[in-house]
Amino acid sequence: MSKMEPYVRPSRLLRPDGSPDNNDRVEIGPTQLAFNEWRELGLTAPNLEAMRHYRLDRIVQQLQAQDLAGILLFDPLNIRYATDTTNMQVWITHNHARACFVSADGYMVLWDFHNCDHLSAHLPLVKEVRSGASFFYFETGDKTAEHAAHFAQEIDELLQSHAGSNRRLAIDKIEIAGLWSIEALGIEVSDGQRVMEHARVIKSLDEINAMRCSIAATEAAMHLMRDASQPGVTENDIWA
């Protein structure tokens, strides 16, 4: 992972996965070594831009089919599916400091941890990056209800802007203070996990290519670990 200045002009050259061939950026993903190995195996790298558009379209289709105004996501895996962003995945699984809102018209807002805007600077589908989705006791203490109420007001404003009179919002997982604050504004909450699981049901060709490449990389790593596992060798030596 390298550092990206947000005002650097994007490179016109593309890598096999459709990403700009510019190392002066923050973006998770494979290196040239992986691209070379996949090519030798006869595998096709996924086009990440196309995959991101496909996933957003799948979410929007589910929202429209269920007459939902939008969906609010806190599960880091669901946020990754919707935005292709990641940040402190394990910590965020326990402490919901990130969130994502997707409206039925495809407008996407990401709440990231403070000072982390650069992590999504390369993603044009993320229309806004905000902070302030933290309303759990470890972070906000006795002011949790206050923080939750402020966040709920932001959601209410987004619904009014993008859904008019539709007050039906899907949520996957949320801290109880946030749920209370959202429902107090007259917003009807429904199951967001159902929406996301149905969105994932049909895979695109790029998603299938991504899985094939991921499996190949994992299998290669496991073979290396197996070959390095010898009597008297420590786990640290194997990982190294």
Q: How would you label these PLM feature ranges?
A:
Residues M1-A220:
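A composition/biophysics-driven feature that prefers long, compositionally simple stretches
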Residues I215-M225, E235-I238:
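Active-site pocket-lining segments that scaffold enzyme catalytic pockets across diverse folds
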Residues L48-R52, Q230-A240:
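Signal-transducing coiled-coil linker helices
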